[in-house]
Amino acid sequence: MSEITHRTKTRPVKVGPLTIGGNNEVVIQSMTTTKTHDVEATVAEINRLAEAGCQIVRVACPDERAADAIPEIKKRISIPLVVDIHFNYKLALKAIEGGADKIRINPGNIGRREKVEAVVNAAKEKGIPIRIGVNAGSLEKRILEKYGYPTADGMVESALHHIKILEDLDFHDIIVSMKASDVNLAIEAYEKAAKAFDYPLHLGITESGTLFAGTVKSAAGLGAILSKGIGNTLRISLSADPVEEVKVARELLKSFGLASNAATLISCPTCGRIEIDLISIANEVEDYIAKIKAPIKVAVLGCAVNGPGEAREADIGIAGARGEGLLFRKGEIVRKVPEETMVEELKKEIDKLAEEHYAKQAAEKEKLNT
């Protein structure tokens, strides 16, 4: 697989223990669907997201009750917390004081300069970044009057306007998003933004739709953007359980070789040659490898026609036949296994590969520390 090159001059920005931008990997984000003031429900959902592979989570902060909940939520989660603020600068101040790792605002809708300055000074004091969220659906009136309708140039102009507000206050820990529901508009906006400034870009196709339609739309748009080396964090926005957003994001990054800590499944589309229940097997294996944090490529193939060649591209795999399967490792046949134990044997081999990877990681880490 050819390697995707990221913008090399992207400014690195810290979000909690993570660094966004620079030469770092693309980070997966999601957003809670709970009422933020409901601490129990919000924490439970965030922990489910983290278990699924979410690395940064955003919560809405529409009122004082939500802002008051931030300290308790922050205490009980393991991933960085982003707080989403609109209009009320006092909520931003309270969220920052409560332990937010990042806030998302549009400086232009916070109010007078002194209000923006208060938020910026609080963020500076705590050492947290600000995400400027540009959205095609809520561009400033003056920009819509200038361009007639939402355009990529208008979105970039909006971003630069908000960036300048922060830069004029000597604030540079900035992340920018350029979201649109229209895929072509989003692609163009991100391409132009990548050339206009060096701040990290958070990717997203907003209002993309339901689980099925939204997955296709997001993969089409964000895949095109990622293929150009653009993007430092991303969220798949779906009208679904947010855990599904994380699953789709992981698969998308794996497709481009941009996830070094995730296992990947290759499985054939099935045909009349298939003599095993390949679909059930593939689903079971996919579920099994979902939580493995190692770059293992696993193949589940249905016959001997394409099996050996395709298994050569995988670290471990099985090619099924009537009553038995061939277990492959790095393209070499390891052994024949009965159909009834085929999946369990494959899982054992997956575990061995994962343990080898973890041991290698630990050795490298120890070497760096000595």
From Swiss-Prot:
Pathway: Isoprenoid biosynthesis; isopentenyl diphosphate biosynthesis via DXP pathway; isopentenyl diphosphate from 1-deoxy-D-xylulose 5-phosphate: step 5/6. InterPro entries: Dihydropteroate_synth-like_sf (IPR011005), IspG_bac (IPR016425), IspG_bac-typ (IPR004588), NO2/SO3_Rdtase_4Fe4S_sf (IPR045854). Its cofactor is [4Fe-4S] cluster. It is an enzyme of class 1 (oxidoreductase). Converts 2C-methyl-D-erythritol 2,4-cyclodiphosphate (ME-2,4cPP) into 1-hydroxy-2-methyl-2-(E)-butenyl 4-diphosphate. NCBIfam families: ispG_gcpE (TIGR00612), PRK00366.1 (NF001540). PANTHER family: 4-HYDROXY-3-METHYLBUT-2-EN-1-YL DIPHOSPHATE SYNTHASE, 4-HYDROXY-3-METHYLBUT-2-EN-1-YL DIPHOSPHATE SYNTHASE (FERREDOXIN), CHLOROPLASTIC. Belongs to the IspG family. This is 4-hydroxy-3-methylbut-2-en-1-yl diphosphate synthase (flavodoxin). It comes from Bacillus licheniformis (strain ATCC 14580 / DSM 13 / JCM 2505 / CCUG 7422 / NBRC 12200 / NCIMB 9375 / NCTC 10341 / NRRL NRS-1264 / Gibson 46). The lineage of its organism: Bacteria, Bacillati, Bacillota, Bacilli, Bacillales.
